[in-house]
């Protein structure tokens, strides 16, 4: 654990990975100063509420559903895309809620998920070596836009403001209405080739809604049935953006990163002695850490010591991302070592990043079956070790893209090019995401019955 006094800027004294170099240092400082003058995107009290919800997840009184785009885009920003994402998250949540008889904590990868880590600093584009694309908040995807520009942080902030405004409206309006969301699911079951597999759950939800209405419960007049809590999250990768959005809460005198309710550290930046861990140890938001197949028990426990030294329940989420072929070998030993130490940890699964492959044409994709297999293994391993599979973390979209192969739509390698729009990694489309939710619902129900 670092013995240095923490401040929003103390990370500058630590080694940093996956960070851009800006040529114009004066412009960088000007942009950061302007960002610091802007209102917070979220409030400290909301982040505390989320921590309380995540504490309930650890106590097996709720389940975490975290999902959204691989990377948000300036050019593809639209109200319809936000609506479609929110809609499919609500559809997934109602299925999981009913199957598990448990509240679902809904956290979007949205309103700030602009930066992406890259394996290499440069790449070849049109036979020319250029800087790698690191997300719209840093540089552009075209060859002429590869130089990092500080002013992109301002555009990311303003787009996040607009996104949050729309999400808050959806969460308090008709799009979160329980009856309306269930109608969306009925359409999915009706129009899906494998609909019969999910018909039983859909029928039982219909019966439950009918029973409530027969008892005089009017959904339109019952806030708990037409409004939802929806929280935001992103990877805290670009610390030049995160630092100026830190605020000291007037009620608790504690620091919060007000760019999102929840933040996470990626597999490439989780060095306990690195800048990203140093920055996040000092803010009181709930924190996630991606845990890959090579993580050791000692590394994970050191991260727990640095990021959650007081073992606060709901503070720390370990997001396992090992791949369907590796998780059965690596996760049991890791769980055994960490569970001995009695840490309050929310364990969730990211079944996307460990299952990325390239087709014969060099196109990045993920197989739905591999994603599903890793989720299944995650639940099975937790059961065997006497622990809880407490959440799922997905890269997904509400659109009808063709980026991941398989699922009930039987997307093939040959059909990927039909609607392949991602600027970074392949995402589950709306149908695949909802299909996965129905399948996870069965696992959650079984876990709850134990």
Residue positions per predicted region:
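Glycine-rich, charged/polar anion/phosphate-binding loops
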Residues: 49-51, 273-276, 332-334
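Short loop/turn segments at strand-loop or loop-helix junctions that form parts
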Residues: 65-70, 107-110, 349-352, 395-397
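A general structural signal for short secondary-structure junctions and capping/turn motifs
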Residues: 54-57, 95-97, 279-280, 381-384
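N-terminal basic/disordered segments at the start of proteins
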Residues: 1-63
């Amino acid at each position: 654990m670092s013995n240095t006094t923490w401040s929003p800027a103390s990370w500058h004294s630590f080694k940093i990975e996956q960070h851009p170099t800006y040529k114009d240092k004066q412009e960088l400082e000007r942009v950061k100063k302007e960002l610091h003058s802007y209102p917070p995107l979220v409030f400290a009290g909301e982040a505390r509420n989320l921590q309380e919800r995540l504490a309930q997840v650890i106590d097996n009184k709720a389940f975490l559903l975290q999902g959204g785009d691989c990377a948000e885009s300036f050019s593809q920003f639209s109200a319809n895309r936000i609506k479609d994402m929110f809609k499919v998250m609500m559809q997934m949540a109602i299925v999981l809620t009913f199957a598990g008889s448990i509240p679902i904590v809904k956290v979007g990868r949205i309103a700030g998920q602009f930066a992406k880590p890259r394996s290499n600093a440069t790449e070849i584009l049109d036979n020319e070596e250029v800087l790698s694309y690191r997300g719209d908040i840093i540089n552009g995807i075209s060859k002429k836009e590869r130089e990092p520009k500080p002013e992109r942080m301002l555009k990311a902030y303003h787009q996040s403001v607009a996104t949050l405004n729309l999400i808050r409206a959806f969460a308090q309006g008709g799009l979160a209405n329980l009856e309306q969301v269930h109608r969306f699911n009925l359409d999915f079951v009706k129009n899906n080739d494998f609909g019969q597999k999910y018909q039983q759950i859909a029928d039982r939800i219909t019966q439950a809604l009918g029973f409530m209405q027969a008892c005089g419960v009017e959904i339109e007049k019952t806030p708990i049935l037409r409004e939802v809590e929806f929280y935001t999250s992103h990877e805290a990768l670009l610390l030049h953006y995160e630092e100026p959005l830190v605020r000291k809460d007037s009620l608790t005198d504690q620091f919060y990163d007000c760019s999102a309710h929840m933040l996470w550290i990626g597999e490439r930046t989780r060095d306990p002695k690195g800048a990203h861990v140093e920055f996040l140890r000092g803010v009181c938001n709930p924190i996630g850490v991606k845990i890959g197949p090579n993580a050791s028990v000692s590394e994970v426990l050191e991260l727990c010591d640095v990021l959650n030294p007081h073992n606060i329940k709901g503070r720390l989420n370990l997001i396992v991302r090992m791949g369907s072929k590796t998780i059965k070998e690596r996760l049991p030993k890791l769980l055994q070592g960490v569970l001995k130490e009695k840490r309050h940890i929310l364990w969730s699964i990211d079944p996307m990043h460990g299952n990325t492959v390239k087709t014969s044409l060099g196109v990045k994709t993920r197989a739905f079956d591999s994603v599903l297999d890793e989720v299944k293994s995650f639940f099975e391993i937790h059961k065997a070790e006497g622990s809880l599979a407490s959440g799922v973390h997905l890269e997904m979209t509400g659109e009808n893209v063709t980026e991941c192969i398989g699922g009930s739509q039987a997307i093939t390698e040959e059909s990927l090019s039909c609607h392949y729009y991602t600027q970074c990694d392949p995402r589950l489309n709306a149908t695949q995401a909802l299909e996965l939710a129905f399948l996870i619902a069965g696992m959650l129900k079984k876990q709850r019955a134990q």
